[in-house]
Amino acid sequence: MLPFIVKLHIRNTSLGDLSWLPESMNRRADFFLYGKNVVLFVIAVIMILNIIDRILIRNEKAGNVKYLLPLCGYGITVILSTIFSKSKDVALRGMIEQYEGMWILLAYVIVAIYSYIIVQSEKDMECICMTMLTAGILQSVFGIAEILGGEILSTSLFRNIIVGQQYKELAGHMVFGFMGESYQRVSGTLYNSNYAGIYFAMILLLGIFLFVKWDGKKRIYAAVASVLSLICLIGSGSKSAILCMLAVMIWCAAEALFRKQRKQVLYLLAASAVIGCGYFIYDSVFGVHTIQRITESLDLQEKTDKLTDIRVLKDHISIIWDGETYALCMEKEGKSLYPHVFAKDGSELELVSDEKRQICWPETMEGQDIYLQCYYKDGVPYMAVFHNDIRWLFTDVVDDRYTYINIWGKPDEVISAPSVGFKGKEHWFTDRGYIWSRTIPLLKNKILVGSGPDTFMLQFPQNDYVARAAQGYGFFSEIITKPHCMYLQIAVQTGVLSLVFFLCLPIGSGIKYRRNRYRNLKKDGEKQKDHTYVDGIECLIIFYLLTGITNDSMVVLAPLYWVLLGVFMKNVKPALDKVRPVF
């Protein structure tokens, strides 16, 4: 139910007061996250009451609670990070474009504990798997409609439901879709095409697993869910989803070979062939060029920009261009303004003018994509430096010194943020190299506790303008709201210690499960038995953790992971009446 919730919520943020944000950020609309946030919190409260009823009233066993200790440790670090946060309101309620405040992170913990306690049998796990397939099929209806050029959420019925009575006048002006794309990407009700891709890849992996395990009508159901999920996965255009899914399938094939399960290897090879054909056909029909998009994002060549530094000083602007330092200033003569450029030794550079475009440039920088312009606007003198389709605007009327005016028209400081690694490689993985290199230095003061849940945007050096400009105008004008890495997200916001607890959960459970499994194999004379649904759940957990390298935790997907993690930690061992190998 949770992934399907879409509801308009308009929030007053007061963020527009920050120098690096536009005034429009004071009031923001949300459709896909806040509603899910509220419903998840209500579900978590119901789960707590159910747990109390089962354990304290009915005296049911909760299982070995020692396996929940890392989970409790994670929850404690979340609470402590909120208590010590400088932005407590954000840490409690969450930030726009994320809405993962303390209450939601604790709700994830409750979801995992509930799954750990409640799931008792193979029948329970079959119910979870069947529910996931059904949800995947329903979600694919939205996705296939988008591929065919429609948008279910944009129909008048859904628009009126989404906005409600309070904002009904907005219903006729709403259109859902991705702007600036050459083709319609699938996102469904999952906020973003990347998260939609991850979701459909999880359903596809589960469908392949269940197709091998199930018989009869249930096998057909798994096949239908797999095919529909594959179509929507391809339509999402998510690069990380397909790459991580292929990595998991290779891992499964290697393990099947190790266990001498040739039949499972053939199933995986057949599934890989179908996936490959699906991408080839889709690319041919829609001209998407998936392979090209993947290789472009994996372009590992170093890239550098000639403009590497800007310092705004009292009486001039200092820039480093192609390794050389220059001083820029403007001279006022009556109603006219004249730019001047000086070399490091104090000599003035000759300027070449283009009267038609009213720009000029140093003669020694002819054809190097750097131009100067001075002008008055509303009586205020400005000097603009143009490079790489970006305008750097300066004035000298603020506090009687030179000041940078950012693209939002606000005076701001230009800083050079500390970085670790990725020098010349900031463009790697769709500019994630830059974000990661500026995020890692933030960790040194966040070992025990972090800055608070959902406060990454307030911690990131948003005014590291020069380094961002080197990645192009699109990235330069973007507000960095998340690190695009779940592990950095956790470490910054709730502390490195919380990341250790977070990783202890799947890694510790995985080691325990594999140790028990191979011990049983040895006892049975290396005869492979059906390991029920736990193998499939393990694959989904590994897949989700892999996608976390380049994606963040989001309320649209995270609850599903925590459900699976709780089940996996319980490591259910039902009676095995049927022997049927599963990869």
Positions of PLM-derived features:
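Juxtamembrane membrane-water interface segments that cap and precede transmembrane helices
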Residues: 14-33, 90-91, 172-189, 434, ...
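Interfacial/capping segments of alpha-helical transmembrane domains
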Residues: 9-21, 152-164, 450, 460
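Non-cytosolic membrane-interface motifs at loop->transmembrane helix junctions
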Residues: 92-102
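TM-adjacent membrane-interface loops and short helices in multi-pass inner/ER membrane proteins
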Residues: 151, 192, 323-325, 329-331, ...
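Long, low-complexity, polar/charged, intrinsically disordered or flexibly structured peripheral segments
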Residues: 350, 355-427, 442
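Alpha-helical transmembrane segments of multi-pass inner-membrane proteins
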Residues: 1-7, 36-53, 66, 70-88, ...
